[in-house]
Protein backbone atom coordinates (compact mmCIF):
# COMPACT_ATOMS: atom_id res chain seq x y z
CA UNK A 1 0.00 0.00 0.00
CA UNK A 2 1.35 3.43 -0.92
CA UNK A 3 -0.18 6.87 -0.48
CA UNK A 4 0.65 8.66 -3.72
CA UNK A 5 -0.92 11.96 -2.70
CA UNK A 6 -3.17 13.54 -0.08
CA UNK A 7 -5.53 16.48 -0.68
CA UNK A 8 -7.36 18.44 2.01
CA UNK A 9 -9.90 21.27 2.00
CA UNK A 10 -11.24 23.07 5.10
CA UNK A 11 -9.75 20.38 7.35
CA UNK A 12 -8.99 21.68 10.85
CA UNK A 13 -6.19 24.28 10.60
CA UNK A 14 -4.74 22.97 7.33
CA UNK A 15 -4.53 25.26 4.32
CA UNK A 16 -6.01 23.73 1.14
CA UNK A 17 -3.29 21.51 -0.29
CA UNK A 18 -2.30 18.51 -2.36
CA UNK A 19 0.86 16.79 -1.15
CA UNK A 20 2.70 14.02 -3.00
CA UNK A 21 4.53 11.35 -1.01
CA UNK A 22 7.38 9.14 -2.25
CA UNK A 23 8.16 5.61 -1.16
CA UNK A 24 10.22 5.41 2.01
CA UNK A 25 10.10 7.91 4.85
CA UNK A 26 8.60 11.38 4.59
CA UNK A 27 9.59 13.59 7.50
CA UNK A 28 7.37 16.50 8.56
CA UNK A 29 8.81 18.90 11.11
CA UNK A 30 7.81 22.18 12.70
CA UNK A 31 6.70 23.81 15.90
CA UNK A 32 3.81 22.50 17.98
CA UNK A 33 0.49 23.67 16.55
CA UNK A 34 1.86 23.91 13.01
CA UNK A 35 -0.54 21.23 11.71
CA UNK A 36 1.63 18.11 11.81
CA UNK A 37 -0.80 15.98 13.82
CA UNK A 38 -3.75 17.24 11.79
CA UNK A 39 -1.98 16.14 8.61
CA UNK A 40 -1.55 12.61 9.94
CA UNK A 41 -5.15 12.59 11.17
CA UNK A 42 -6.34 13.61 7.68
CA UNK A 43 -4.18 10.92 6.09
CA UNK A 44 -5.50 8.24 8.46
CA UNK A 45 -9.08 9.33 7.80
CA UNK A 46 -8.58 9.27 4.03
CA UNK A 47 -6.86 5.88 4.14
CA UNK A 48 -9.21 4.09 6.53
CA UNK A 49 -12.37 6.18 6.81
CA UNK A 50 -11.87 6.10 10.58
CA UNK A 51 -11.64 8.85 13.18
CA UNK A 52 -11.82 8.87 16.96
CA UNK A 53 -13.34 12.33 17.38
CA UNK A 54 -16.72 12.37 19.10
CA UNK A 55 -18.20 15.02 16.79
CA UNK A 56 -17.34 15.22 13.10
CA UNK A 57 -17.80 19.00 13.22
CA UNK A 58 -14.51 19.13 15.12
CA UNK A 59 -12.71 18.21 11.90
CA UNK A 60 -14.23 21.07 9.88
CA UNK A 61 -12.31 24.34 9.80
CA UNK A 62 -13.84 27.10 11.89
CA UNK A 63 -16.30 29.15 9.84
CA UNK A 64 -16.74 26.47 7.15
CA UNK A 65 -19.67 24.11 6.66
CA UNK A 66 -17.86 21.17 5.10
CA UNK A 67 -14.41 19.57 4.87
CA UNK A 68 -12.88 17.15 2.40
CA UNK A 69 -9.90 14.79 2.26
CA UNK A 70 -8.74 12.64 -0.63
CA UNK A 71 -6.11 9.91 -0.89
CA UNK A 72 -4.68 8.69 -4.18
CA UNK A 73 -3.47 5.14 -3.52
CA UNK A 74 -1.45 2.42 -5.20
CA UNK A 75 -1.89 -1.17 -4.09
CA UNK A 76 -0.80 -4.29 -5.94
CA UNK A 77 -0.20 -2.32 -9.12
CA UNK A 78 -3.70 -0.79 -9.09
CA UNK A 79 -4.54 2.87 -8.52
CA UNK A 80 -7.59 4.11 -6.64
CA UNK A 81 -8.99 7.34 -5.21
CA UNK A 82 -10.58 7.44 -1.76
CA UNK A 83 -12.54 10.53 -0.71
CA UNK A 84 -14.11 11.54 2.58
CA UNK A 85 -16.57 14.42 2.81
CA UNK A 86 -17.48 15.85 6.21
CA UNK A 87 -20.38 18.14 7.00
CA UNK A 88 -23.50 18.53 9.13
CA UNK A 89 -22.42 15.67 11.37
CA UNK A 90 -22.21 13.24 8.46
CA UNK A 91 -19.36 11.44 6.77
CA UNK A 92 -19.58 10.49 3.09
CA UNK A 93 -17.06 8.03 1.65
CA UNK A 94 -16.29 7.38 -2.00
CA UNK A 95 -13.92 5.06 -3.83
CA UNK A 96 -13.29 6.00 -7.45
CA UNK A 97 -16.37 8.20 -7.35
CA UNK A 98 -18.75 5.54 -5.99
CA UNK A 99 -20.27 5.94 -2.52
CA UNK A 100 -19.22 3.21 -0.09
CA UNK A 101 -19.34 2.40 3.62
CA UNK A 102 -16.31 2.54 5.90
CA UNK A 103 -16.16 -1.26 5.90
CA UNK A 104 -15.65 -1.23 2.13
CA UNK A 105 -12.34 0.66 2.38
CA UNK A 106 -9.06 -1.31 2.53
CA UNK A 107 -8.95 -2.43 6.15
CA UNK A 108 -5.20 -2.87 6.37
CA UNK A 109 -4.19 0.44 4.86
CA UNK A 110 -2.66 2.39 7.77
CA UNK A 111 -1.34 2.25 11.33
CA UNK A 112 -1.04 5.44 13.39
CA UNK A 113 1.40 5.68 16.31
CA UNK A 114 0.79 8.59 18.70
CA UNK A 115 2.28 9.82 21.99
CA UNK A 116 -1.09 9.32 23.70
CA UNK A 117 -0.92 5.58 22.97
CA UNK A 118 0.41 5.18 26.52
CA UNK A 119 -3.24 5.50 27.56
CA UNK A 120 -3.71 1.99 26.16
CA UNK A 121 -1.75 0.88 29.21
CA UNK A 122 -2.70 3.41 31.88
CA UNK A 123 -6.17 4.43 30.68
CA UNK A 124 -9.60 2.89 31.12
CA UNK A 125 -10.64 -0.68 30.19
CA UNK A 126 -12.93 0.81 27.53
CA UNK A 127 -9.91 2.33 25.75
CA UNK A 128 -8.11 -1.01 25.63
CA UNK A 129 -11.31 -2.77 24.57
CA UNK A 130 -11.84 -0.22 21.80
CA UNK A 131 -8.26 -0.77 20.57
CA UNK A 132 -8.82 -4.52 20.40
CA UNK A 133 -12.25 -4.24 18.77
CA UNK A 134 -11.01 -1.73 16.19
CA UNK A 135 -8.10 -3.98 15.24
CA UNK A 136 -10.21 -7.14 15.04
CA UNK A 137 -12.85 -5.32 13.00
CA UNK A 138 -10.16 -4.47 10.47
CA UNK A 139 -8.93 -8.05 10.42
CA UNK A 140 -12.42 -9.51 9.93
CA UNK A 141 -15.48 -7.97 8.32
CA UNK A 142 -17.58 -10.63 10.03
CA UNK A 143 -16.27 -9.59 13.45
CA UNK A 144 -17.14 -5.97 12.67
CA UNK A 145 -20.68 -7.01 11.71
CA UNK A 146 -21.15 -9.19 14.78
CA UNK A 147 -19.82 -6.46 17.06
CA UNK A 148 -22.20 -3.88 15.57
CA UNK A 149 -25.14 -6.25 16.04
CA UNK A 150 -24.07 -7.02 19.58
CA UNK A 151 -23.79 -3.32 20.47
CA UNK A 152 -27.26 -2.65 19.05
CA UNK A 153 -28.69 -5.58 21.00
CA UNK A 154 -27.11 -4.35 24.24
CA UNK A 155 -28.65 -0.90 23.65
CA UNK A 156 -32.07 -2.41 22.98
CA UNK A 157 -31.82 -4.70 26.00
CA UNK A 158 -30.81 -1.76 28.19
CA UNK A 159 -33.87 0.16 27.02
CA UNK A 160 -36.05 -2.82 27.94
CA UNK A 161 -34.37 -3.04 31.36
CA UNK A 162 -35.01 0.64 32.03
CA UNK A 163 -38.66 0.15 31.06
CA UNK A 164 -38.97 -2.81 33.42
CA UNK A 165 -39.85 -5.20 30.57
CA UNK A 166 -38.69 -8.36 32.33
CA UNK A 167 -41.04 -10.44 30.17
CA UNK A 168 -38.92 -9.58 27.08
CA UNK A 169 -35.54 -10.47 28.57
CA UNK A 170 -35.40 -14.00 27.20
CA UNK A 171 -35.55 -12.63 23.64
CA UNK A 172 -32.65 -10.25 24.20
CA UNK A 173 -30.72 -12.83 26.23
CA UNK A 174 -30.82 -15.39 23.42
CA UNK A 175 -29.51 -12.81 20.94
CA UNK A 176 -26.78 -11.62 23.33
CA UNK A 177 -25.56 -15.14 24.06
CA UNK A 178 -25.22 -15.99 20.37
CA UNK A 179 -23.54 -12.74 19.31
CA UNK A 180 -21.47 -12.31 22.47
CA UNK A 181 -20.15 -15.87 22.39
CA UNK A 182 -18.95 -15.39 18.81
CA UNK A 183 -17.15 -12.19 19.85
CA UNK A 184 -15.47 -13.81 22.86
CA UNK A 185 -14.25 -16.78 20.84
CA UNK A 186 -12.88 -14.58 18.05
CA UNK A 187 -11.07 -12.37 20.57
CA UNK A 188 -9.45 -15.41 22.17
CA UNK A 189 -8.20 -16.77 18.85
CA UNK A 190 -6.85 -13.44 17.64
CA UNK A 191 -5.21 -12.62 20.96
CA UNK A 192 -2.90 -15.62 20.70
CA UNK A 193 -1.07 -14.14 17.71
CA UNK A 194 -1.36 -10.54 18.92
CA UNK A 195 0.29 -11.51 22.22
CA UNK A 196 3.12 -13.31 20.41
CA UNK A 197 3.86 -10.30 18.21
CA UNK A 198 3.62 -7.83 21.10
CA UNK A 199 5.99 -9.95 23.20
CA UNK A 200 8.53 -10.01 20.35
CA UNK A 201 8.32 -6.24 19.94
CA UNK A 202 8.60 -5.68 23.69
CA UNK A 203 11.81 -7.74 23.72
CA UNK A 204 13.16 -5.90 20.66
CA UNK A 205 12.63 -2.65 22.57
CA UNK A 206 15.04 -3.89 25.23
CA UNK A 207 12.58 -4.87 27.94
CA UNK A 208 13.88 -7.55 30.28
CA UNK A 209 10.39 -8.35 31.51
CA UNK A 210 8.22 -10.60 29.33
CA UNK A 211 4.93 -9.14 28.11
CA UNK A 212 1.81 -11.31 27.98
CA UNK A 213 -1.58 -10.13 26.71
CA UNK A 214 -4.81 -11.67 27.90
CA UNK A 215 -8.50 -11.08 28.47
CA UNK A 216 -10.33 -10.28 31.68
CA UNK A 217 -13.77 -11.65 30.83
CA UNK A 218 -16.94 -10.88 32.77
CA UNK A 219 -18.41 -14.16 31.53
CA UNK A 220 -17.64 -17.04 29.16
CA UNK A 221 -19.50 -18.55 26.19
CA UNK A 222 -20.25 -21.57 28.38
CA UNK A 223 -21.76 -19.60 31.28
CA UNK A 224 -23.12 -16.49 29.52
CA UNK A 225 -26.80 -17.51 29.54
CA UNK A 226 -26.65 -18.49 33.22
CA UNK A 227 -24.83 -15.28 34.18
CA UNK A 228 -27.47 -13.14 32.47
CA UNK A 229 -30.27 -14.90 34.34
CA UNK A 230 -28.48 -14.78 37.69
CA UNK A 231 -27.94 -11.01 37.46
CA UNK A 232 -31.43 -10.18 36.19
CA UNK A 233 -32.58 -8.39 39.36
CA UNK A 234 -29.37 -6.34 39.54
CA UNK A 235 -29.68 -5.33 35.89
CA UNK A 236 -33.32 -4.31 36.24
CA UNK A 237 -32.36 -2.13 39.19
CA UNK A 238 -29.47 -0.41 37.38
CA UNK A 239 -31.09 -0.35 33.93
CA UNK A 240 -28.08 -1.73 32.06
CA UNK A 241 -26.49 -5.01 31.01
CA UNK A 242 -23.83 -5.93 33.57
CA UNK A 243 -22.07 -8.82 31.88
CA UNK A 244 -20.77 -9.62 28.41
CA UNK A 245 -17.89 -8.75 26.07
CA UNK A 246 -18.75 -5.04 26.33
CA UNK A 247 -17.49 -5.26 29.94
CA UNK A 248 -14.25 -7.13 29.24
CA UNK A 249 -10.69 -5.79 29.40
CA UNK A 250 -7.49 -6.40 27.45
CA UNK A 251 -4.96 -7.33 30.14
CA UNK A 252 -1.21 -6.76 29.97
CA UNK A 253 1.12 -8.63 32.30
CA UNK A 254 4.70 -7.37 32.47
CA UNK A 255 6.87 -9.85 34.30
CA UNK A 256 4.66 -11.06 37.14
CA UNK A 257 2.49 -7.98 37.59
CA UNK A 258 -0.39 -6.17 35.80
CA UNK A 259 1.14 -3.42 33.68
CA UNK A 260 -1.86 -1.15 34.20
CA UNK A 261 -1.05 -0.98 37.93
CA UNK A 262 2.70 -1.49 38.23
CA UNK A 263 4.41 -0.42 34.98
CA UNK A 264 6.51 2.74 35.01
CA UNK A 265 5.76 5.49 32.50
CA UNK A 266 8.71 4.33 30.41
CA UNK A 267 7.55 0.72 30.49
CA UNK A 268 4.08 1.89 29.50
CA UNK A 269 5.46 3.66 26.44
CA UNK A 270 7.37 0.50 25.53
CA UNK A 271 4.22 -1.62 25.79
CA UNK A 272 2.25 0.88 23.70
CA UNK A 273 4.90 0.78 20.96
CA UNK A 274 4.89 -3.02 21.11
CA UNK A 275 1.10 -3.05 20.65
CA UNK A 276 1.31 -0.80 17.61
CA UNK A 277 4.03 -2.86 15.98
CA UNK A 278 1.98 -5.98 16.65
CA UNK A 279 -1.00 -4.25 15.01
CA UNK A 280 1.10 -3.44 11.95
CA UNK A 281 2.41 -7.00 11.65
CA UNK A 282 -1.05 -8.56 12.09
CA UNK A 283 -2.52 -6.37 9.35
CA UNK A 284 0.41 -7.20 7.07
CA UNK A 285 -0.08 -10.93 7.67
CA UNK A 286 -3.82 -10.69 7.04
CA UNK A 287 -3.73 -8.59 3.86
CA UNK A 288 -0.38 -9.49 2.33
CA UNK A 289 1.15 -6.00 2.34
CA UNK A 290 2.38 -3.63 5.00
CA UNK A 291 0.20 -0.63 5.84
CA UNK A 292 1.27 2.97 5.48
CA UNK A 293 2.86 3.85 8.82
CA UNK A 294 2.01 7.21 10.42
CA UNK A 295 4.19 8.26 13.36
CA UNK A 296 3.29 11.40 15.28
CA UNK A 297 6.06 13.21 17.19
CA UNK A 298 8.72 10.50 16.91
CA UNK A 299 10.91 11.98 19.65
CA UNK A 300 8.21 12.88 22.20
CA UNK A 301 9.29 11.73 25.67
CA UNK A 302 11.24 8.84 24.16
CA UNK A 303 14.68 7.66 25.19
CA UNK A 304 17.26 6.83 22.47
CA UNK A 305 16.28 3.13 22.40
CA UNK A 306 12.58 3.74 21.79
CA UNK A 307 13.31 6.56 19.37
CA UNK A 308 15.66 4.32 17.36
CA UNK A 309 13.00 1.58 17.40
CA UNK A 310 10.44 3.94 15.87
CA UNK A 311 12.81 5.16 13.17
CA UNK A 312 13.88 1.60 12.34
CA UNK A 313 10.22 0.61 12.12
CA UNK A 314 9.56 3.49 9.73
CA UNK A 315 12.48 2.40 7.57
CA UNK A 316 11.22 -1.22 7.50
CA UNK A 317 7.90 -0.48 5.77
CA UNK A 318 7.39 0.59 2.15
CA UNK A 319 6.09 4.00 3.22
CA UNK A 320 5.98 6.04 6.42
CA UNK A 321 5.15 9.63 7.35
CA UNK A 322 6.98 10.75 10.48
CA UNK A 323 6.37 14.05 12.28
CA UNK A 324 8.38 15.84 14.94
CA UNK A 325 9.69 19.17 16.13
CA UNK A 326 12.98 18.21 14.50
CA UNK A 327 13.76 16.54 11.21
CA UNK A 328 13.57 12.76 10.93
CA UNK A 329 16.94 11.35 9.81
CA UNK A 330 17.11 9.42 6.55
CA UNK A 331 13.90 10.83 5.08
CA UNK A 332 13.37 10.60 1.32
CA UNK A 333 11.34 13.82 1.54
CA UNK A 334 11.26 16.44 4.28
CA UNK A 335 8.40 18.92 4.67
CA UNK A 336 8.45 21.95 6.92
CA UNK A 337 5.12 22.65 8.66
CA UNK A 338 4.09 26.19 9.46
CA UNK A 339 0.59 27.53 10.14
CA UNK A 340 -1.10 24.60 8.40
CA UNK A 341 1.10 24.75 5.30
CA UNK A 342 3.78 22.30 4.20
CA UNK A 343 6.80 23.18 2.07
CA UNK A 344 9.60 20.88 0.90
CA UNK A 345 12.89 21.31 2.73
CA UNK A 346 15.78 20.94 0.25
CA UNK A 347 18.25 19.60 2.80
CA UNK A 348 18.52 19.00 6.54
CA UNK A 349 18.75 22.10 8.66
CA UNK A 350 21.94 20.75 10.28
CA UNK A 351 23.62 20.57 6.88
CA UNK A 352 22.58 24.14 6.08
CA UNK A 353 24.01 25.34 9.39
CA UNK A 354 27.27 23.56 8.70
CA UNK A 355 27.54 25.17 5.27
CA UNK A 356 26.80 28.60 6.74
CA UNK A 357 29.48 28.12 9.39
CA UNK A 358 32.07 27.11 6.78
CA UNK A 359 31.17 30.15 4.68
CA UNK A 360 31.52 32.40 7.70
Swiss-Prot record:
- Has UniProt tagged this entry with the keyword Secreted? no
Q: Which gene encodes it?
A: recF
Q: What does this protein do?
A: The RecF protein is involved in DNA metabolism; it is required for DNA replication and normal SOS inducibility. RecF binds preferentially to single-stranded, linear DNA. It also seems to bind ATP.
> Which residues of the sequence carry a binding annotation for ATP?
30-37
Family of this protein: Belongs to the RecF family.
Gene3D superfamilies with a match to the protein in the record: P-loop containing nucleotide triphosphate hydrolases, RecF/RecN/SMC, N-terminal domain
Domain of life (superkingdom): Bacteria
Q: Which PROSITE patterns match?
A: RECF_1, RECF_2
Q: Name one Pfam family in it.
A: SMC_N
User: What are the recorded GO MF terms, alphabetically?
Assistant: ATP binding; single-stranded DNA binding
What main location does UniProt list?
cytoplasm
Q: What is the lineage of its organism?
A: Bacteria, Thermotogati, Deinococcota, Deinococci, Deinococcales
The source organism is Deinococcus deserti (strain DSM 17065 / CIP 109153 / LMG 22923 / VCD115)
Q: What is this protein called?
A: DNA replication and repair protein RecF
Q: Which UniProt keywords apply?
A: ATP-binding, Cytoplasm, DNA damage, DNA repair, DNA replication, DNA-binding, Nucleotide-binding, SOS response
Gene Ontology cellular component annotations, sorted alphabetically: cytoplasm
